[in-house]
């Protein structure tokens, strides 16, 4: 009898009145209804309202659909943070297609691979990057030969750029974006996906440790992340958000969709400099922005003439992408920024943990606060499970702040999988978890703290060294602007730490040999002897488009330097 009652309750059907697939596209529809005249996107002298943005997105969807672009199609966009990039996050999935945001800092061979691998049938490209698209297509055609089918090419004009590149693109047969929109219907009757598991976006990993892989995201995950971001961050209706984070990186951590939730205002930036960040904060009363630690480092070390301090109001900053040094968090706080430290991956739609602030931390010394806030924290509201597991047994490590293991996730904010890569999917989803490849400890308060990427751990004389912890010490040296520590071959210990350092401008003319010795001495006073860098290399550090230092390049450089000769420690 009990079983029958349970079945009667459970078997009530899903019908159109009580069920629709979750998709972030509905947030745009609502914003246009509730706040039709509120500013949605500002880019230089161009401003759009939510009503206008909704109409433009529907025009884009309609124009694509008229050219038989829809479910099963992929639309690539190669552009910086401009209105068209924002519109693509809605207009492309509105016609049922998948959005593929391409990193503008990649070279033509890599872009050619991504466009071919994703089978993008449309390429939307900012005028400044038309040559990149053109070179990529030429490489694709050379490889494919007579079987090559040229994608539809749409060039996005930008009033802040010189017209020559736009004119050249048009002379090559590209369709201008505004002309393309004009062919679409602003009342296009878009439909939500039939299944929320339907793909909404495709992005490629940055390749900081390996070749990029295609990460496929679904409507359900994008919807949940779009709601989780403002909930975790305490964002208010009408937030003013500065686009310092590239939208092409993991769909801007899903903030294009989050801003529609809030009917907020996007302030676009083509190029990010500390001076522009301060200027936009003052001009538009920016309340929030996201940035990698390298951008925070530039902000706190900006020349006085580039800053506007004290800040006219509190500005909230979300950082992720690499473990931020506590010294940088401390400096940001001193300047009036309130930093929320998060952690995540392209495979988890962006941030999926947050170092949630606790009231009892308020009374602690600022340095202690910064150290606590440098941890990666606890799972996002929309992420069902997070743990740190022993890589050999698969069991959770103790919450002792010492025992290291791998960070793993399980939930609706985990990707569908890697495109056309079954072997990688089998490995990354082993045991029913998504394996991050990041090594961390779990503290007694259950906050996690990353110690390293599994590939970045330095093994010296059989002992593990956390490159992150060595970097945190190096960052405290007064001459250091940026630092990254990798393994270098060592004749005695197999490997030893090698520090790659970018100097602050005041120290660039100093004797580098003396500075290297001083940095090593500084580290020796604060670290175990075998953790101290045995070599220091000065110069700019290679980075991804989001500011993450590319350690795989530095590891190659360190290897090419040859082994450290018979060091004692």
Curated annotation (Swiss-Prot):
GO terms for cellular component: cytosol; peroxisome. A motif (Microbody targeting signal) lies at residues 567-569. CDD domains: ttLC_FACS_AEE21_like. Keywords: Fatty acid metabolism, Ligase, Lipid metabolism, Peroxisome. The keyword Ligase applies. Expressed in roots, leaves, stems, flowers and developing seeds. It is an enzyme of class 6 (ligase). Its EC number is 6.2.1.1, 6.2.1.2. The keyword GTP-binding does not apply. One of its GO terms (molecular function) is acetate-CoA ligase activity. It catalyses: acetate + ATP + CoA = acetyl-CoA + AMP + diphosphate; a medium-chain fatty acid + ATP + CoA = a medium-chain fatty acyl-CoA + AMP + diphosphate. GO terms for biological process: acetate metabolic process; butyrate metabolic process; glyoxylate cycle. Disruption phenotype: No visible phenotype under normal growth conditions, but seedlings have a strong decrease in glutamine and are resistant to the toxic acetate analog monofluoroacetic acid. It is found in: Peroxisome. Belongs to the ATP-dependent AMP-binding enzyme family. PANTHER family: ACETATE_BUTYRATE--COA LIGASE AAE7, PEROXISOMAL, ACYL-ACTIVATING ENZYME. Peroxisomal acetate/butyrate--CoA ligase that is probably involved in the activation of exogenous acetate for entry into the glyoxylate cycle. May play a role to prevent carbon loss from peroxisomes during lipid mobilization. In vitro, is active with both acetate and butyrate. This is Acetate/butyrate--CoA ligase AAE7, peroxisomal.
């Amino acid at each position: 009898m009990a079983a029958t009652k349970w079945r009667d309750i459970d078997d009530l059907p899903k019908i159109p009145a009580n069920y629709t697939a979750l998709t972030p596209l509905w947030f745009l529809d609502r914003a246009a209804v509730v706040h039709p005249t509120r500013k949605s996107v500002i880019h230089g002298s161009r401003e759009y309202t939510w009503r206008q943005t909704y109409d433009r997105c529907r025009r884009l969807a309609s124009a694509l659909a008229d050219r038989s672009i829809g479910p099963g199609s992929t639309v690539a966009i190669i552009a910086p943070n401009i209105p068209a990039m924002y519109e693509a996050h809605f207009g492309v999935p509105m016609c049922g297609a998948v959005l593929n945001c391409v990193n503008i800092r990649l070279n033509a061979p890599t872009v050619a691979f991504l466009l071919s691998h994703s089978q993008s049938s449309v390429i939307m490209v900012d005028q400044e990057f038309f040559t990149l698209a053109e070179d990529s297509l030429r490489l694709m055609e050379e490889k494919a030969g007579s079987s090559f089918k040229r994608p539809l090419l749409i060039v996005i004009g930008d009033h802040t750029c010189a017209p020559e590149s736009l004119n050249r693109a048009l002379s090559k047969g590209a369709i201008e974006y505004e002309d393309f929109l004009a062919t679409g219907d602003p009342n296009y009757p878009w439909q939500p996906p039939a299944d929320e598991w339907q793909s909404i976006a495709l992005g490629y990993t940055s390749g900081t440790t390996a070749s990029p892989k295609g990460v496929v995201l679904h409507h359900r995950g994008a919807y949940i992340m779009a709601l989780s971001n403002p909930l975790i961050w305490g964002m208010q209706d009408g937030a003013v958000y500065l686009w310092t984070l590239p939208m092409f990186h993991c769909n801007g951590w899903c903030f294009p969709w989050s801003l529609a939730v809030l009917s907020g205002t996007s302030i676009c930036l083509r190029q990010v400099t500390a001076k522009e960040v301060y200027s936009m904060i003052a001009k538009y009363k920016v309340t929030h922005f996201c940035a990698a630690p390298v951008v925070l480092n530039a902000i706190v070390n900006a020349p006085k003439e580039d800053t506007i301090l004290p800040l006219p109001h509190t500005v909230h900053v979300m950082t992720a992408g690499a473990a931020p040094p506590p010294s940088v968090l401390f400096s940001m706080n001193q300047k009036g920024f309130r930093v929320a430290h998060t952690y995540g991956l392209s495979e988890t739609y962006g941030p999926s943990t947050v170092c949630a602030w606790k009231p009892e931390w308020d009374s602690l010394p600022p340095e202690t606060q910064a150290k606590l806030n440098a941890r990666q924290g606890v799972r996002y509201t929309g992420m069902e499970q997070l743990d740190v597991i022993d890589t050999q047994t698969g069991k959770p490590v103790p919450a002792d702040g010492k025992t290291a293991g791998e960070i793993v996730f399980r939930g609706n904010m985990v990707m569908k999988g890697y495109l056309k890569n079954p072997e990688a999917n089998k490995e990354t989803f082993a045991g029913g978890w998504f394996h991050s490849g990041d090594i961390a400890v779990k503290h007694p308060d259950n906050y996690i703290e990353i110690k390293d990427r599994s590939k970045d751990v330095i093994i010296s004389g059989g002992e593990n060294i956390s490159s992150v912890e060595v970097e945190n010490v190096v960052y405290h040296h007064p001459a250091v602007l940026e630092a990254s520590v990798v393994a270098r071959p060592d004749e005695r210990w197999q490997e030893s730490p090698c520090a790659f350092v970018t100097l602050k401008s005041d120290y660039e003319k100093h004797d580098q040999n003396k500075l290297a010795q001083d940095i090593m001495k500084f580290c020796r006073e604060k670290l175990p002897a075998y953790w101290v860098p045995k070599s220091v290399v000065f110069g700019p550090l290679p980075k991804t488009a989001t500011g993450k230092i590319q350690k795989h390049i530095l590891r190659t450089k360190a290897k090419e330097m040859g082994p450290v000769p018979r060091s004692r420690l």
